[in-house]
Amino acid sequence: RASISFNTSTTFDIAAYGIPEFQNHYTGVSTSWGSDIKGSPDYTDDFFKTGVTTINSLSLSMGSQAMQTYFSYANTYGKGVVEGNSLVKHNFNFRETANFLNNKLTVDANINAMYQRGNNRTTSGGYYMNPLVGLYHFPRGGVEGGKDFNYYKDNYQILNAGRNIMDQNWYKSQGTDMEQNPYWLINKVPNEDTRYRTLLNLSVKYKFNDLFS
């Protein structure tokens, strides 16, 4: 007897609960407590996207009283709330159970394999190379010269004519280790992490009698 099942699910994520509450009425200095500007757009709303995660899974089971086989595969694909952040994950599971010698001997073997690749994960709880630091620290309403956050979003890099390369464009001297243009980090300093995991399990059980095995 064989049984096949397929399941799929999709979830949507928003960054509503992790965003600090900002004041958008005073600007002019880095501490964001300058003159009253009668309100300013909250650019953090435009920075975060709607995350989408889709999981598809397929399983197959078949067998008889003497032997049972089970196989499953699951695929996860997600796009995070920060631009460029994504996750791909594959899970494989195979299990075989067999009975011998009039069900006195049972052999159970299982293998579980996982492959995962993540792109542009934000640093959790850290300052360095974290795009959220520049996003949250940027002065409300813009900086000297009338340059607001959208200007640095659209012009995160500028040409260094002397070296003929593109430099980071940020209101703090091209950025520091602790605060940089978020879009420079996302587009020019991407990160990727890959994980592999394989688990093997084998058990052999022999039943001598009803009391001992």
Regions found by a protein language model. Give the residues of each.
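Transmembrane beta-barrel architecture of outer membranes
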Residues: 53-55, 87-93
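Surface-exposed loop/interface segments of Gram-negative outer-membrane beta-barrel transport/assembly proteins
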Residues: 2-41, 81-82, 91, 95-199
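Short, P/G- and charge-enriched loop/turn segments at secondary-structure junctions
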Residues: 43-47
